[in-house]
A protein has these predicted regions:
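Active-site neighborhood of phospho(di)ester-bond hydrolases with catalytic His/Asp-centered motifs
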Residues: 105-110
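Protein maturation boundaries and topogenic segments
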Residues: 1-50, 99, 118-136
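PP2C/PPM family metal-dependent serine/threonine protein phosphatase catalytic domain
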Residues: 72-93
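Long, low-complexity intrinsically disordered regions
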Residues: 111-112, 133
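Surface-exposed loops/turns
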Residues: 58, 101-102
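Solvent-exposed loop/turn segments at secondary-structure junctions
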Residues: 26, 40, 62, 69-70, ...
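Mid-length scaffold segments of soluble, non-membrane domains
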Residues: 45-76
Length: 136
């Protein structure tokens, strides 16, 4: 099955506005994935369909320090001062290190101002609807 979605945000986190999701396709590193949000309200209500890029999978080492997110010691993303201000948090509030467990994925947007796993942590593979592609 296939689903088509539209990103109507003022500032998108990915370079596309229209997406096609292949439901049931596995989430693979560096590919886009469509999933349903859980536990990140009030910013996004539970069940909101989101498309992000898989940045890390089970067994990958995550370290957040001084406003920078590292995956297996490779710098992947910086925290946005504007997002931190909106959340009323400082970058050091997110400092931590952990290893992704079975069924966990770290997802990021391509935009530096994306609201993603930098701020709310990993998602469960059970939230994944399928692989996504940006088409326009």
């Amino acid at each position: 099955r296939v689903r088509i979605g539209y990103d109507g945000q003022d500032i998108p986190c990915l370079p596309w506005r229209v997406f096609v999701a292949w439901l049931g396709a596995p989430a693979l590193p560096d590919q886009l994935v469509a999933f349903r949000s859980v536990g990140i309200a009030p910013v996004l209500p539970d069940g909101t369909v989101i498309v992000k890029r898989v940045a890390a999978v089970a067994g990958d080492r995550i370290r957040i320090a001084d406003g920078v997110l590292y995956v297996n010691d490779v710098e992947r993303a910086h925290f946005s001062p504007n997002t931190l201000r909106a959340l009323k948090k400082s970058a050091d509030a997110f400092d931590r290190s952990y290893v992704l467990g079975a069924g966990e994925l770290l997802v990021l947007g391509d935009s530096p101002v994306s609201y993603d796993s930098r701020y709310w942590g990993p998602i469960s593979s059970s939230q994944v609807m399928g692989r996504a592609w940006g088409v326009w």
